[in-house]
């Protein structure tokens, strides 16, 4: 029996247990071993994480696909798991140690600290997994993986070794994003750009061979910089080769202020003649652009900052090389200073000696570590790199050939732009938590890369015996006795970038490098659902690794969803205080309501503006359907054995079969096309409007009337249509549908394992064939594609006429503010015989639902009547004596004027180029939406006014 009140929390906990106990989501179920597989890998959330709205959207869409395909009989594997999240996890544990006043990481030592991290993971690392289960994620949780599981770690080591052997992993000295607080290189994704109100310092660099005179511009060249603290590492000044004012200086030298070093003036396109002074200082060791300029001109790289962001000069051989002896005292003065203190000290000295030309206020973007919030330094250091350019070629070819497609397609352009300009991928991190790089160093620094330490020792002993460093006898002894080789080779202390192991996720989770049955069955995967922000960091790298090691792209479709913003369109952030916690919404309105909201708003390519009111609205939708099911139960509506809905004789019942099949087609096609919003809209319209508002209302007189064949058929059809709704709604609202499925009849299987409406599948197959021949299939009416025995044009024409007539009359009553108690007459003008017969058959229903006094027929519409066009025929509402036409005309005129004012106000804003250029994108979009709403409002009032004119 259905409970009187819909209580989401009770249902959700109960249904979660039911699914888990039944193993409902396990891949490879016995009855599906011969079925076509369908695979999705979850974007593994950080083990430190908790559910945010992006997770909620991402996993809702994945779950819709998985439940849909599972009901279509496929062997679904939704592979779950979490990412070890190197920096984030290490920071969490270090913070915990600090809060508990325990020894820090370095005091503990690596081994003990890693034990502590694993302990933290065991105690606290499952939070987000449990939250995903609350959302209803139908993953095969028995296969949950962690990026540092033993099997995945073995895959990481094998990939590293094979890429190194192929020359695709190497060590190099390059600039990296360096976090001076965390003391590690970080990826671009871990860098946030912060707008800072700073200064632009214009510095005078004396031209070699001329006596420097601050008052004589011919004796110096002015360069502008936001980072005077790095100027001691300058190795050139660049001007554009076509800079008419400065090109004559190319080839000459300047004297670096304070240091006295002679550095060249080079010609390079990087210098913008229209920007600043037209001359730029080149510091290859402290700027990414300067690094490339330095490589083009073979400039030395002088790093003047250490790992902690302090000036390092006194013992810096690169800095001291070629430095005049008189500059050493200044070097000692700045040595060891924090970079920002050094900035002030250096500027003061520059001003003292006349090298400071001017200071201008300057607002610019400064990179910060997203976790430490420290200003990130471009830092020159030895790191491990992947030759991403080589791996990118086949990854681009896979998308160009159609092996992998992006949805929406415009994201392919973004993918190609990044891949075509891809840089070497820095994969080493100066952390302890993560996959330690499988490289060992011999006594002379020789590198040995191997999957295990034993293999590395074997390579090292063989090499040093061959080189004569040790004898064969010594080598054999060291091989036999671990004590003799202790400390002979030392492992690289760095760990791999978290994205390195994540790049292997589609196949490492299946047991690779072993040839497991899972690898053979579930790779490649079908769909990847992810956000646009990690196309480069994750999607592209999975493509590279998957194609290189598996010889196939890891997925056939990449669906890119948009951002979830607040109701005003602003990006959610803690600083703004506008973050919406999905779990709060789940607690208040239920997981089903949140899921349906996110799916209904997931328009391809458009960010979601989320408000709690929308979630509340869909909770009300769930409640309405719940109450409809209670009505069916209370009136003994059940599906008899061997019930055939296509054998119905009652027009109303034939109509609901037609509408159900039509909706099944729409929902199926929309989900297959990743148009989640269209699928949700179709099922919402059907449940709320067709089933609840029309079918049940029209069926009530029969159901509540005397026993008859019509009553029996109608009760059966009410239950049958309810069951079809449960199936179609299940991917979006799994909890309420599974509960109602269980309590409304004796079932042989869970709803989540029940067959999707089959006739919709048959329609889909036919539609696929048509689409192959007609690229404009999207414009074809969905009713043209219904299977013949699920299509009933006569029933649709009859009930559709009743629905259209009642809807139009209700609309006029609302527009004219006619009170519900006031009954109006209806005249069908020039009605066909069929329309006359329909009006008579449905007279009581039409009068009751439209609040009519009577229905009559005439050759023409009477004077003073509002005319409605219903399927090509005129229905007239004589309103004389019912409506004050003059007052309504005045009211509608005011509404139109108000809408015009709103449109004009928005148009004025949108015509302002300053507003368009400076306002945040979400504000501009909000204004455009306001205009659309005002225009729609105006159109409605204009239409009402036109109708009113006919009543005069």
Curated annotation (Swiss-Prot):
An annotated GO BP: valyl-tRNA aminoacylation
PROSITE patterns (alphabetical): AA_TRNA_LIGASE_I
InterPro entries referenced in this protein's UniProt entry, alphabetically: aa-tRNA-synth_I_CS, aa-tRNA-synth_Ia, Anticodon_Ia_Val, M/V/L/I-tRNA-synth_anticd-bd, Rossmann-like_a/b/a_fold, tRNA-bd_arm, tRNAsynth_Ia_anticodon-bd, Val-tRNA_synth_C_sf
Ranges in a coiled coil: 894-950
Catalytic activity: tRNA(Val) + L-valine + ATP = L-valyl-tRNA(Val) + AMP + diphosphate
Motif 'HIGH' region location, chain numbering: 45-55
GO CC terms, sorted: cytosol
Localisation: Cytoplasm
One MF annotation (Gene Ontology) recorded for this entry: valine-tRNA ligase activity
The protein's Enzyme Commission number: 6.1.1.9
SUPFAM superfamilies noted in UniProt: Anticodon-binding domain of a subclass of class I aminoacyl-tRNA synthetases (SSF47323), Nucleotidylyl transferase (SSF52374), tRNA-binding arm (SSF46589), ValRS/IleRS/LeuRS editing domain (SSF50677)
Keywords annotated in UniProt: Aminoacyl-tRNA synthetase, ATP-binding, Coiled coil, Cytoplasm, Ligase, Nucleotide-binding, Protein biosynthesis
Major subcellular location class: cytoplasm
Binding site for ATP: 574
Motif 'KMSKS' region, residue numbers: 571-575
UniProt cross-references to Pfam families, sorted A to Z: Anticodon_1, tRNA-synt_1, Val_tRNA-synt_C
Subunit text: Monomer.
Domain note: ValRS has two distinct active sites: one for aminoacylation and one for editing. The misactivated threonine is translocated from the active site to the editing site.
Family of this protein: Belongs to the class-I aminoacyl-tRNA synthetase family. ValS type 1 subfamily.
Function statement: Catalyzes the attachment of valine to tRNA(Val). As ValRS can inadvertently accommodate and process structurally similar amino acids such as threonine, to avoid such errors, it has a 'posttransfer' editing activity that hydrolyzes mischarged Thr-tRNA(Val) in a tRNA-dependent manner.
Protein name, UniProt field: Valine--tRNA ligase
Lineage, highest ranks first: Bacteria, Pseudomonadati, Pseudomonadota, Alphaproteobacteria, Hyphomicrobiales
